[in-house]
Swiss-Prot record:
Higher taxonomy: Bacteria, Bacillati, Cyanobacteriota, Cyanophyceae, Synechococcales
The protein's Enzyme Commission number: 7.1.1.-
Places the protein is found: Cellular thylakoid membrane
Name by which UniProt lists this protein: NAD(P)H-quinone oxidoreductase subunit N
One Gene Ontology term, aspect cellular component: plasma membrane-derived thylakoid membrane
Membrane topology note: Peripheral membrane protein
Pfam family, one: NdhN
HAMAP family cross-referenced by the UniProt entry: NDH1_NDH1N
Keyword Secreted belongs to the record: no
Record text on subunit structure and interactions: NDH-1 can be composed of about 15 different subunits; different subcomplexes with different compositions have been identified which probably have different functions.
């Protein structure tokens, strides 16, 4: 249990690899302690779900268009058959303005494909201020490894 009390090994692994795949107990609690330790050491943290990301790199870092849900009968002549496209600012845009490093914690990472995981791993290498932790499932005790090792293992 001393591993969870300090979080030092987790933080040093996160700083050296940039992107970690984590297996945590399903009852929760361990990841919250790690997040609290990261915040105390000067990181900004954001927790979000991996479901519905689409292209993760574009969703997180670039201006992109979305189509709002269809709400019944609408005038087709106004916006075409597909509906209007709304431009959305990237999720990490405002968080990277400050000098503090950012940890993005992605829940339900097991839904991401191998190519999406590789793209996220490349994002960590291109932008050194972004550190990403992806929950890839459950385990009896908390375990983590670099994301590229996790991808190559399968």
């Amino acid at each position: 249990m001393p591993l969870l009390l300090s979080g030092q090994k987790f933080r040093t692994d996160l700083e050296s690899f940039g992107c970690l795949a984590i297996l945590s107990p399903l009852e929760g609690g361990a990841e919250t302690r790690l997040l609290r330790r990261l915040r105390a050491s000067g990181y900004q943290t954001q927790v979000t779900s991996a479901r519905g990301l689409g292209d993760p790199v574009v969703f997180l870092t670039q201006l992109h268009g979305i189509r709002p849900p269809h709400l019944g009968h609408q005038n087709v002549g106004r916006n075409g058959a597909l509906g209007e496209v709304q431009q959305v600012i990237p999720q990490l845009n405002e968080l990277l303005v400050e000098d503090k490093p950012l940890v993005l914690w992605l829940l339900e990472g097991q839904v991401l494909s191998k190519s999406e995981l590789l793209a996220i791993n490349n994002l960590c290498q291109k932008e050194p201020r972004i550190k990403i932790v992806i929950e890839m499932g459950g385990a009896r005790s908390i375990k983590w490894q670099p994301l590229n090792e996790f991808i190559n293992k399968d």
